[in-house]
Amino acid sequence: MQKGIIKLNTLPSILSNGSVVGKKEHDGPLGDCFTFEMPTWEQSESEMQRLALNEALDKSGFKIHDIDAIFAGDLINQCTSSGYGLANFDAPFFGLFGACSTIAEGLLLGS
């Protein structure tokens, strides 16, 4: 991993995405828009993080070594689910904790 100031060769962009949800979200009006469901959020959050990243990589055609950094967070203290779910990926991980603002925080920091 590079140390110091990082200068990007290309502008940041969102090239792919993946989404996973719990049972209640899947049973809602947008249920068909999601990739994955599990019985409870707590049982599945780490797996959901892993699946979402794999889904985004698969859709984009990228491999993990093409990724400069992962910005992710969750609603469990100290980004436990994100940390465990993404631990086996060989890319720098930035754990975000902003509760409901985590998605906006990730988009802002990632861009």
Show where each model-derived region lies.
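Conserved "HGTGT" condensation-loop signature of ketosynthase/thiolase-family condensing enzymes
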Residues: 1-94
